[in-house]
Swiss-Prot record:
Annotated EC: 2.8.1.8
SMART domains: Elp3
Main EC class the enzyme belongs to: transferase
Gene assigned in the entry: lipA
Claim: Cell cycle is one of the keywords in the record: no
Naturally occurring in which organism (per UniProt): Shigella boydii serotype 18 (strain CDC 3083-94 / BS512)
Domain of life: Bacteria
Protein name: Lipoyl synthase
Cofactor(s) this protein requires: [4Fe-4S] cluster
Main location: cytoplasm
Subcellular location: Cytoplasm
Length: 321
């Protein structure tokens, strides 16, 4: 077990330092050999990285963050090369320390009051028609960051009136009433909150989160705005069974969720939870068929699918896998 550390405000803690603070068994110790990636998990990198570097430069110029970079998303090259990115607001330091996630943990600094304006200008400069806004968890804020989400939505729409906005929000633990009062007053076009995995291994995968709380968050937003699609996603390959995934899908439908994403979990480093299995493309196709039969209007299911992967196409109901 790594030696516990004293966190300094504004410092990013990753890998061994981050995992040392997790109140579960350190999965990086004494585990079996890593699974070999199957052929279908091989990523093709674009030959020209000009567009990728351009997006990174725009982010740096305005002091913005993308979850694509901060979470080491395997689709970064593809998405950046197509001129799309998922913006991460409220800084790049998360107050949670989930052992599947590569976003840094620590004591974050105060939110940047100018971030909504800078974000809106960057999006306008990039001439985006669909944008996904997500954030780190901010358990240090009284509203969990909900007002900052609302401020970003307002600023973006002022600069780009025709744009579609999807928000991928945290669970607002202990702050649901306050957060929903704010978010339902300034709603996005798609409201997304990920369950991430199945109840049986929730404490291991999402320490500090609660499965039923997340379902209730999705349900209550839908009750306030029945006309707005609600969306959720899971990572698979962490030890769950296909039957458990299907049961989570049923729970989501019972709570009014209409859009679903399922993708393969990939281990960011040796300090994170190991991959227990690789789910085949055929299995993903079967789960998509199950989802559509349950009444999901959209289901993006495939090895490289992530919540915001081609989110504009997902929202249009186009095939994403």
């Amino acid at each position: 077990m790594s030696k516990p550390i004293v966190m300094e405000r504004g410092v990013k803690y990753r890998d061994a330092d981050k995992m040392a603070l997790i109140p579960v068994k350190n999965v990086a110790i004494e585990r079996e050999a890593l699974l070999r990636k199957p052929e279908w998990m091989k990523i093709k990198l674009p030959a020209d990285s000009t567009r990728i570097q351009g997006i990174k430069a725009a982010m740096r110029k305005n002091g913005l963050h993308s979850v694509c970079e901060e979470a080491s998303c395997p689709n970064l090259a593809e998405c950046f090369n197509h001129g799309t990115a998922t913006f991460m607001i409220l800084g790049a330091i998360c107050t949670r320390r989930c052992p599947f996630c590569d976003v840094a943990h620590g004591r974050p600094v105060a939110p940047d009051a100018n971030e909504p304006v800078k974000l809106a200008q960057t999006i306008a400069d990039m001439a985006l028609r669909y944008v996904v806004i997500t954030s780190v968890d901010r358990d240090d804020l009284r509203d969990g960051g909900a007002q900052h989400f609302a401020d970003c939505i307002t600023a973006i729409r002022e600069k780009s009136p025709q744009i579609k906005i999807e928000t991928l929000v945290p669970d607002f633990r202990g702050r649901m009433d306050r957060a929903l009062d704010i978010l339902t007053a300034t709603p996005p076009d798609v409201f997304n909150h990920n369950l991430e995995n199945v109840p049986r291994i929730y404490r291991q995968v999402r320490p500090g989160a609660d499965y039923n709380w997340s379902l209730k968050l999705l349900e209550r937003f839908k009750e306030a705005h029945p006309e707005i699609p609600t969306k959720s996603g899971l990572m698979v390959g962490l030890g769950e069974t296909n039957e458990e995934i299907i049961e989570v899908m049923r729970d989501l439908r019972r709570h009014g969720v209409t859009m679903l994403t399922l993708g393969q979990y990939l281990q960011p480093s040796r300090h994170h939870l190991p991959v227990q299995r690789y789910v085949s493309p055929d299995e993903f196709d079967e789960m998509k068929a199950e989802a559509l039969a349950m009444g999901f209007t959209h289901a993006a299911c495939g090895p490289f699918v992530r919540s915001s992967y081609h989110a504009d196409l997902q929202a249009k109901g186009m095939e994403v896998k």
